[in-house]
Amino acid sequence: MTIYMFHGYTSSANDHWFPWLAEKVEAELNIPFKKLDFPDSDHPVESVWDQYCETHINPKDGITLVGHSLGCIQVLHYLDQHDIHNVNVLLVFGFDESIWTLPELNSFTDHPVDYSNVLPKILKVTVISAINDDSVPYPYTLTLARHLHAKFVLMPSGHHFTDAGKDKQLPIAFEELRQILR
């Protein structure tokens, strides 16, 4: 079993809370954690990110996919495009529709996710948001959670979890991931 981390817009594999989560998962859960580092995240192109996934993810049943922000819709695209099953999913500040705050990302949501194809592939899924996120307002993430029939965790604060505090940790992500993997 391997966990793959999908970062978001203007981000990289070594930003925010991603390195902390990778270290924590590998140390405490003894599961390989691969942080994907998508090209040109300041000007993302869906087809380029799709190709990156093709060359960096081993599409095996039972993998776990973790996404943040734009990485969440990329997780769904990946699931839609591959014949894999029993996939665990953790999405943090995800969306599956155009967002007024980030119109530059509309190309990733121009074609709707085929949930009739995606849902049967998912074993467990949790979606996390914060009530005060200005980048991806939580109603977008709640809609995504409803489409996925997911457990939804709404934090009272945290904005977009891009700083995750001075220590760059996001304990709720680890706790929810641990529960998903039980």
What do these predicted regions represent?
Residues 84-97:
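A conserved short beta-strand
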Residues 121, 126-129, 133:
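Short beta-strand/loop motif that positions the catalytic acidic residue
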Residues 32, 146-162:
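Catalytic histidine neighborhood in serine/cysteine hydrolases
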Residues 44, 158-170:
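Catalytic histidine-centered segment of alpha/beta-hydrolase-like enzymes
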Residues 66-76:
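Gly/Ala-rich beta-loop-alpha elbow adjacent to hydrolase catalytic centers
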Residues 134-140:
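Conserved alpha/beta-hydrolase "acid-adjacent" motif
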Residues 42-50, 94-118, 165:
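Flexible "cap/lid" loop of the alpha/beta hydrolase fold
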Residues 2-61:
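Active-site catalytic motif of lipid deacylating hydrolases and related acyltransferases
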